[in-house]
Design a protein with these regions (language model features):
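Hydrophobic anchor at the beta1->P-loop junction of P-loop NTPases
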Residues: 33
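P-loop (Walker A) phosphate-binding loop of NTP-binding proteins
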Residues: 36
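ATP-binding Walker
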Residues: 39
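Walker A/P-loop
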Residues: 42
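Conserved substrate/cofactor phosphate-moiety recognition/catalytic segment
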Residues: 50-108
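ATP-dependent NMP and nucleoside kinases share a basic, alpha-helical "lid"
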Residues: 117-171
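Small-molecule kinase domains that catalyze NTP-dependent phosphoryl transfer to phosphate-bearing small molecules
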Residues: 160, 165-211, 215-219
Length: 219
């Protein structure tokens, strides 16, 4: 057999063997967390990681934004044609709010987060997805994307006054963005579990999520 013929056959053999090994691995377990900025998602995600015996990877939109050059985004109030920036508005009560504006490159990065998540799930990695889906429609897109996997969808709520206080104290958030997200984020969608990061401790919420995930996996 010539070397040229042998190499493709060898590659096919390797890929076939890998597929057999992958099929023997446990199916990926996924926890999808959706909540407004400053609601405590990252703290919760890290606590969940530490609580499981099996490793879970922590993915999120903030991590994807860290891939981007700083100059492409504008978090100070100006317009960023390609990346992320803020769009000023007023809510129904007249309060000033700021919506996230995503330019074409930012939209590609949002889609990249989804593609990375699917790729890792297809390789049987357990995932905790830490998201800021700004509408119920975006959550429904995730549901469609991950429909072939065991996913626990968790909505995170926190009283508006608490979000706004955290927003002010952090100093790295646009004042008014928490209010905008609070008003629209959980509309027109549903979750397997809703938790309040203000009313319950992180440990209590971790226990609730793990219990709900176990019940879902048994169905």
């Amino acid at each position: 057999m010539s070397v040229k013929k042998f190499i493709p056959s060898f590659v096919v053999c390797i890929l076939f063997c890998y597929s057999l090994v992958a099929n023997e691995l446990p199916v990926a377990k996924i926890i999808y967390l959706n909540g407004p900025s400053s609601c405590g998602k990252s703290t919760l995600a890290k606590a969940l990681q530490e609580s499981f015996e099996d490793p879970f990877l922590h993915l999120g939109i903030d991590k994807v934004i860290d891939f981007m050059p700083d100059k492409i985004n504008n978090w100070e109030g100006g317009y960023a044609p390609l990346g992320f920036s803020w769009k000023a508005d007023n809510d129904a009560t007249g309060h000033p709010i700021f919506h996230v504006h995503a330019g074409p490159f930012a939209k590609r990065m949002i889609e990249t987060l989804k593609m990375i998540s699917v790729l890792l799930a297809s390789q049987n990695f357990n995932l905790i997805i830490d998201d800021v889906a700004l509408s119920g429609a975006e959550v429904e897109e995730w549901k469609q994307l991950l429909k072939n996997y065991d996913v626990l969808y968790v909505g995170i709520v926190t009283p508006l006054e608490v979000l706004e206080e955290r927003e002010r104290s952090r100093g790295d958030r646009r004042i008014g963005s928490a209010r905008a997200q609070y008003q629209t984020m959980h509309k027109n969608t549903s979750y397997d579990l809703t938790i309040d990061t203000h009313a319950q401790t992180t440990a209590e919420n971790v226990a609730k999520i793990k219990e709900a995930l176990l019940k879902k996996l048994k169905k």
